[in-house]
Amino acid sequence: MFKRSSGVLAHVTSLPSPHGVGTMGRTACEFIDFLADAHQTYWQVLPLGHTGFGDSPYQCFSAAAGNPYLIDMDLLVEYGLLTADEVRSGDFNASPDVADFEQLADTRWPLFRKAYSRVTPEMKAAIADFTEENREWLPDYALFMALKEEKYHHAPVYMWPEKDVRDRRPEALARVTEELRGEIDFRIFLQYICLLYTSDAADE
């Protein structure tokens, strides 16, 4: 027989946070401790992928990529990539009990780019190893996001004007990869950070 047990279904973004949405960093670890104290066995978190329009966890760009909005901004301070004042400047005085994805999109990405500009040589080496370990999906994902968000301004794939890119012609992909190298590396960095926060929460 199975032992009777119970748990909670809640997406990570629903956790209270001073930074717009709950994250897989400190807020998730505190919630896990709360569940343990309440003698709960399970936390069903729902998908944690990189969401698109509407921010639905069931409409993601990748089955493997994490959602950058779930990065704990305080952890970026601990890693030395942002200052506490910079993180506070990105807050929008919203209630910690309300998720506002539109304002989050306006405030979070400039901070992510600032953090990326401060990556250390040691972290670059770790990111290179991470990229190699995830070569089956990460480079394609990062290229796709750079194309969609930067080159084609969030247009759906069928509206991309360059047919050879839409059709994934090798010479076209090589061209846009070179053109968007900085944007691709930025998105790989975000996925590396996503791995760090996921590992921290899993250790709980």
Region annotations inferred by a language model:
Residues 1-19, 173:
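N-terminal small/glycine-rich loop or linker at the start of catalytic domains
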Residues 24-32:
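Short, acidic/polar
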Residues 35, 45, 144:
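Conserved, mostly hydrophobic/aromatic
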Residues 41:
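Short acidic/polar active-site loop segments enriched in Thr and Asp
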Residues 44-54:
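Short, solvent-exposed turn/loop segments enriched in Gly/Ser/Thr/Pro and often Arg
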Residues 60-82:
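Acidic, His- and aromatic-enriched active-site or binding-groove loops in soluble protein domains
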Residues 83-196:
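Active-site-proximal, well-structured secondary-structure segments within enzyme catalytic domains
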Residues 197-202:
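Conserved small/polar residues in nucleotide/adenosyl-binding loops
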